[in-house]
């Protein structure tokens, strides 16, 4: 009974937007990549907010509700719609260009897998971006000029179009949730409360 009550409480909080839904979580984001309908990078805008720390006012990353990030160790593992410059742009200051290209390629493959059949301009813009973006020419791109040092420092980036943030698009959200609940590579199990199969993380949320 206690577990069932906790489950109902969780679902109520989720519906009210007070906690993240399964497959989603709070992520610190520093910049938004604005894409045109053809996938071209039009500009990069800081989404950092001013915060008071002690006697100083500093710029801090904005916390957004995004697809749950992967747990990285030493291998290459891309995140969906939000990552650092190595994965989304194919450039960083780590001095390992071959590995950085592997990161970009992995990120491109993930987005092609999840967005290929999504009938939404935002999804198609992201696909077009990955298919046309040239990491070797990235540092020369005018959109990066103003924030290049901060971007290479490792902050997270997200995609945005004229419609808004891509991760907030209903069709894109559905694509991610379908992938997360049925096509993840991690261990799976049956929830004792709902009887639904899903990633172990989903089942543990109910306990």
Predicted regions and their residues:
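Short, non-ligating residues that shape and space the ligands of small metal-coordination modules
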Residues: 197-201
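Short Cys/His-rich metal-coordination motifs, predominantly Zn2+-binding knuckles/fingers
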Residues: 194
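Conserved small/polar residues in nucleotide/adenosyl-binding loops
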Residues: 205-207
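Conserved phosphate-interacting/catalytic interface
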Residues: 1-189
């Amino acid at each position: 009974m206690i577990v069932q009550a906790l489950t109902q409480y969780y679902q109520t909080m989720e519906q009210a937007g007070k906690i993240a839904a399964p497959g989603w979580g709070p992520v610190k984001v520093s910049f938004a990549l604005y894409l045109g309908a053809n996938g071209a990078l039009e500009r990069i805008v800081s989404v950092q907010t001013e915060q008071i720390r002690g006697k100083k006012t500093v710029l801090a990353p904005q916390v957004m509700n995004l697809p749950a990030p992967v747990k990285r160790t030493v291998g290459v593992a891309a995140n969906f719609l939000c990552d650092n410059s190595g994965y989304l742009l194919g450039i960083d200051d780590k001095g390992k260009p071959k590995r950085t290209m592997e990161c970009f390629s992995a990120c491109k493959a993930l987005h092609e897998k999840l967005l290929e059949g999504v009938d939404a301009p935002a999804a198609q813009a992201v696909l077009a971006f990955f298919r046309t973006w040239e990491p070797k020419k990235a540092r020369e791109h005018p959109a990066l000029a103003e924030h290049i040092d901060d971007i290479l420092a490792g902050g997270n980036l997200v995609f945005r179009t004229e419609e808004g943030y891509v991760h907030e698009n209903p069709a894109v959200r559905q694509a991610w949730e379908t992938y997360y609940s049925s096509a993840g590579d991690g261990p799976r199990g049956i929830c004792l409360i709902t009887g639904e199969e899903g990633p172990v993380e989903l089942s543990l949320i109910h306990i």
